[in-house]
Amino acid sequence: MMLNIFRDSPCMNNPIHPSAVLYAGSRIFPQLAACEHFAGSEKMLGKALRIQAELSVDGVPIFDITADCEDGAPAGREREHAEMIAGLILSGENRFDRIGVRIHDVRHPAWRDELETIISRAGQRVAYIVLPKPENAKDVATQIAALDELRSRCGIAREIPVHVLIETPGALHEAWEIARLPHVEVLDFGLMDFVSAHHGAIPATAMRSPGQFDHALVVRAKCGIAAAALGNGIVPSHNVTTEIRDANVVREDARRARQELGFLRMWSIHPAQIQPIVEAMRPDFAEVDEATTLLAAAQDAVWGPIQHEGKLHDRASYRYYWELLQRAQSTGMNIPADARQRFFS
């Protein structure tokens, strides 16, 4: 596969990395693992951490872990549960600093204590905070303001990303406003609560496949979330599948979420779901091969226009292939040694 470069390729001692040149001051699209695994109990979180280490490729985890305060904490023991999670985040078992935390929603009395416990103890290492069940953008803004106040009080300079769980009609209606709020890097879809919020108008069959990909209101919601997220330069994350025994069902759900609806990430609620989700979310191998060849030639041309198989490529196509190559790397695909050296060393 030959590339005809319009100008001579300079011999560069210090080649320019794509992230430094392809975005021209605009926000760089978040590059996150394709799978987000939820666990609530200390036992299941410990198991998830071991699997995260076992499945890592070249020191990069192929899935994130979300420690769950909302559904994981026993009633009345929310603070103790948050303290346990903070301890895990600070522990040596957390090798990659890719543990996020879902706190309670803004109407629950425990959410402020949970957030304060996590940020005051583990704010330097928590990967992200998940905010569930907002009714509108104001709810999200309230919790983000509390997060920022805690960061300031605790002397935490780093940004702590926020993931927002869209699972009510009101939040769906304001998804674009939510996606524009500070620190938000993911919009998640909560299918079960979304269906329940429609008072029986959406049948229970839409909570699982194939109904979740067929019912008009559910598909509309998914398309709206993906469009709002991608339109604001953040990641759309697909809901769970309730199937835990048949890996083919999990894989097909993830494939449809990715290819039909534009989701770049998906929840897992059982360890057996992780690998099928990651596999289904991987880019096509042929496109990865093309990306490595094209990006190497573009870098040699100092990111100027090049010709490839009779077609002109410039920075717009470079951004596409660069983000594709990053997805390949984050899902554990085999990246040629030259591309690893150029872009990921």
Feature-to-residue mapping (PLM):
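Expand to "…catalyze enediolate/carbanion chemistry for C-C bond making/breaking, isomerization
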Residues: 2-345
